[in-house]
Amino acid sequence: MLEILKESLLTCPMVKREKDGVVYNYFINPLTDGIPEVTAELLRDVTAAMMVSLDLKNVDKIVVSEAMGIHIGTALTLATGIPFVVIRKREYRLPGEVVIGQETGYSKGTLYMNCVHKGDRVVIIDDVISTGGTIKGILPALKIAGAELVDILFVVNRGSPDIGIPYKTLVTIDVDENGVKIIDSAF
């Protein structure tokens, strides 16, 4: 399990990026960037690991963040029958919409959560955690909505940030000028 994910990480392209004068190494992977193509085999590999790792008992909804959580949310929904909710970058102004401030290591913006209601039992899944900025915005939004958080899982962990509560990861990596190194794996 996770051999396809690990291979995709170890062989993925790297680019240099810059933010605020700091140059850093950025890995480009199908699950975290949609480039190169996301294969069915990779999604099956990750979905099988998520199903074993997550507490999905009595879960009402899977919560994902736009955009790179959508494909893993779709795969997990197809495998479990549990519907998923996308936290969007666009405001819809629906009743009960929760506005989320988001600041990551790469960007700053606003997200919008709909269709999560009081008493919903939810799991959050996302492609990668590096600074924790996205999840730190989502957690208070779930409280505002009155949802019960059952579990959190990130496919890739780069940085192990403290988000105030425990979370699960499938693969922990480090990235340097030579590429991705796998530090730890759930399987």
Swiss-Prot record:
Belongs to the purine/pyrimidine phosphoribosyltransferase family. Archaeal HPRT subfamily. It is an enzyme of class 2 (transferase). Its EC number is 2.4.2.8. This is Hypoxanthine/guanine phosphoribosyltransferase. InterPro entries: HGPRTase-like, PRibTrfase_dom, PRTase-like, Pur/Pyrimidine_PRTase. Catalyzes a salvage reaction resulting in the formation of IMP that is energically less costly than de novo synthesis. Pathway: Purine metabolism; IMP biosynthesis via salvage pathway; IMP from hypoxanthine: step 1/1. It comes from the Archaea. Disulfide bonds: none annotated. GO terms for cellular component: cytoplasm. Keywords: Cytoplasm, Glycosyltransferase, Purine salvage, Transferase. It catalyses: IMP + diphosphate = hypoxanthine + 5-phospho-alpha-D-ribose 1-diphosphate; GMP + diphosphate = guanine + 5-phospho-alpha-D-ribose 1-diphosphate. SUPFAM superfamilies: PRTase-like. One of its GO terms (molecular function) is guanine phosphoribosyltransferase activity. Its main location: cytoplasm. One of its GO terms (biological process) is IMP salvage. Homodimer. It is found in: Cytoplasm.
